[in-house]
From Swiss-Prot:
GO BP term (any one): translation
Molecular function via GO: structural constituent of ribosome
Keyword Electron transport on entry: no
Name this protein carries in UniProt: Large ribosomal subunit protein bL28
Any one of the GO CC terms: ribosome
Alphabetized UniProt keyword annotations: Ribonucleoprotein, Ribosomal protein
Coiled-coil ranges (or none): none
Gene: rpmB
């Protein structure tokens, strides 16, 4: 499993630990990933995604999982999230007809 948020694309960053004497050693800054179950109101399904902690509050602020994923850019979404977005769009258009 990659250390990457499925909704925002936030991944591992690299930098230095810097001691008091200014010695630098390489380190990794890993995102605070959580496995979260999101419920879609449109498809009435539950989807488990690996997202970072900031993304959880962003989803709530956007008005729910459906609103967030419909506004999200396809370039930052994972393959799994893109498939969920496609399913939500298809269900939404089928209900509107």
């Amino acid at each position: 499993m990659s250390r990457k948020c499925e909704l925002t694309g936030v991944g591992v960053l690299y930098g230095n630990n810097v001691s008091h004497s200014q010695r630098k050693t390489r380190r990794r800054f890993e995102p605070n990933l959580r496995s979260v179950k999101f419920t879609s109101d449109i498809t009435a399904g539950e989807y488990r995604l690996s997202v970072n902690a900031r993304c959880i509050s962003s989803v709530e602020k956007a008005g729910g999982f459906d609103a967030y994923i419909l506004k999200a850019d396809d370039n930052v979404l994972s393959g799994n999230a893109r498939a969920i977005k496609k399913k939500i769009i298809q269900t939404k258009t089928a209900k509107s007809l």
